[in-house]
């Protein structure tokens, strides 16, 4: 809990309430496996919280296939400056997410029941996040239409991150992305560190919303599109 306190700071009590809800209602409703309860903090909450290092200040974030709220709710807890939309098509999951948002009093979060394809053209977000939703090749097709020009997809990936990025090359080229990057965040806080694939959307200059970029995470590897 020492690392959790460092990561969440004054928001730790809110994170603790969320962890308790995940470990009870989340398991009962099939959103979290029973074996995950003992490792909720390291494998799920802290693993997601460190993603905040890669998110610009005051960003509008859409969490695609939010499920139990990972990473969307965690980001909302640790970064109250963010405005987060939890995008989830299944009713039982949106019900769970709505209960979480109300219980934790997260005024910077909205829950939207829809598929990404259904809201393409309606959303123009700064950042899209996704965890364990789909291979990057498919995820990019869903996420990029939800981003403003110059917006970023931050996909939480495992050991196949580099391979998925290579496999998604043709799709990313088709969508005219500006660049891609592999990042590792949370070194020293989670083992292994959280691996992100960052994809920068193409389009106009930047949609009129210039933002101060966060410091590049240690261990990042940049690629050109």
What are these regions (language model features)?
Residues 64-66:
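Conserved beta-strand/loop positions that form the S-adenosyl-L-methionine
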């Amino acid at each position: 809990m020492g690392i959790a306190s460092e990561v969440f700071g004054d928001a730790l009590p809110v994170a603790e309430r969320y962890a308790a809800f995940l470990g009870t209602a989340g398991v009962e409703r099939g959103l979290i496996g029973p074996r995950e309860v003992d490792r909720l903090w390291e494998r799920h909450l802290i693993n997601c919280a460190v993603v905040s290092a890669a998110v610009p200040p005051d960003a509008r974030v859409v969490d695609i296939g939010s499920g139990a709220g990972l990473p969307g709710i965690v980001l909302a807890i640790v970064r109250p400056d963010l405005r987060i939309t939890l995008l989830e098509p299944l009713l039982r999951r949106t019900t769970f997410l709505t209960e979480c948002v109300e219980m934790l009093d997260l005024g910077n979060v909205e829950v939207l029941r829809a598929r990404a394809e259904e809201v393409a053209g309606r959303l123009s977000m700064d950042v899209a996040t996704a965890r364990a939703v789909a291979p990057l090749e498919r995820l990019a097709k869903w996420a990029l239409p939800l981003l403003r020009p110059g917006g970023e997809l931050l996909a939480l990936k495992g050991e196949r991150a580099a391979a998925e990025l290579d496999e998604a090359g043709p799709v990313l080229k088709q969508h005219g992305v500006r660049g891609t990057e592999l990042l590792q965040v949370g070194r020293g806080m989670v083992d292994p560190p959280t691996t992100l694939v960052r994809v920068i959307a193409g389009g106009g200059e930047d949609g009129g919303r210039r933002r101060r970029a966060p410091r590049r995470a240690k261990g990042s590897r940049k690629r050109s599109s």
